[in-house]
Amino acid sequence: MCRTLIDGPVRSAIAKVRQIDTTSSTPAAARRVTSPPARETRAAVLLLVLSVGARLAWTYLAPNGANFVDLHVYVSGAASLDHPGTLYGYVYADQTPDFPLPFTYPPFAAVVFYPLHLVPFGLIALLWQVVTMAALYGAVRISQRLMGGTAETGHFAAMLWTAIAIWIEPLRSTFDYGQINVLLMLAALWAVYTPRWWLSGLLVGVASGVKLTPAITAVYLVGVRRLHAAAFSVVVFLATVGVSLLVVGDEARYYFTDLLGDAGRVGPIATSFNQSWRGAISRILGHDAGFGPLVLAAIASTAVLAILAWRALDRSDRLGKLLVVELFGLLLSPISWTHHWVWLVPLMIWLIDGPARERPGARILGWGWLVLTIVGVPWLLSFAQPSIWQIGRPWYLAWAGLVYVVATLATLGWIAASERYVRIRPRRMAN
């Protein structure tokens, strides 16, 4: 009897311990999620290594594999701080005779990049590519975490996505030019992922100080009521302006009073590489549309569509809501070069592997974007334009240049409509 009295509680305790056993040979995460076999994981590692190696081989062995023109502008433009008053007079024309590239970034970017001019450029270029690839993998991993993944799972898919994404057009041009947009995307994703308001604000504010386009992320912070983070991002951005005024006062004032908003200085508005509303409508009209009635109407219509898409998404879908904001920002900006469209990587992940993947049309959109970007339609269209400066072109080329714009509208429209489908369909089934 005594044994029975003891055995009962003991057995009950053992049963409970087994339920919460963390030393089991099968971790809880593994029991919840089926991990890929070791062979598949090794294959993903091999594919990633081959992809990285092929990209580096292309850079250094192929004719015109990469010219790093934007990285030259970052580094050499920042070096002009040694000669006061020359920052926004600097141009890089060694490999761009058709368009000598000026330093077009906020003055804080020059402060950030200034130390790099002390390092041999060849070493900077190599490290820049490696850091960009690491940032791409980091962006994929954070995208997975925003969709509910854990630190222990998702590495297999992340390696596959990174290996493939290296070769889509936004990333190809990023590597070719030595662009910074992947790092800025990583900062924005991290700002959304972290619960620390001050870190979110710091990341968005600093990123906006280096390049203005990440400022659109503050709209997301306001939309999800992270008001402290949004306000702090403004404070940090203003602090970057203050630092710029202290270091290069006259140049900073010149940028924010004269150069800010001068899209023509950034580059040719109507080249096929500019996949914004302003670029698309300018190609159709045959002249720079500016922010005229047609462009403003297109932006306003897109804003309405983006709001509908935002409202259709579940509150917990942080990545989906962020993507709605970033896609709207790409169409809003006067210039959205193809290397600005690195946001298509988390978009494809969200469509193919995310919470909406089972909805009709999700994977069609995801794979459709992948085909568009692997082919690189704007890049192909660039061969049909006589020069990057010529705005007028045959009507069929002008309309073909809407490719990213139309695909974005289709994506936003699908997000808004698919939620309606989910809400209505169960009622129809019940009838």
UniProtKB/Swiss-Prot annotation:
Top-level class of the enzyme under EC nomenclature: transferase
Entry-linked InterPro entries: GT87
Compartment list: Cell membrane
Any one Gene Ontology molecular-function term assigned to this protein's record: GDP-Man:Man3GlcNAc2-PP-Dol alpha-1,2-mannosyltransferase activity
Membrane topology: Multi-pass membrane protein
Domain of life: Bacteria
Gene Ontology CC terms: plasma membrane
Transmembrane segments: 43-63, 108-128, 148-168, 175-195, 202-222, 229-249, 290-310, 332-352, 364-384, 397-417
Coiled-coil features, chain-numbered ranges: none
Alphabetized NCBIfam families for the sequence: PRK13375.1 (NF009915)
Family, similarity comment: Belongs to the glycosyltransferase 87 family.
Its biological purpose: Catalyzes the alpha-1,2 addition of a mannose residue from polyprenol-phosphate-mannose (PPM) to a monoacyl phosphatidylinositol tetramannoside (AcPIM4) to generate a monoacyl phosphatidylinositol pentamannoside (AcPIM5).
Name assigned to this protein: Polyprenol-phosphate-mannose-dependent alpha-(1-2)-phosphatidylinositol pentamannoside mannosyltransferase
Gene that encodes the chain: pimE
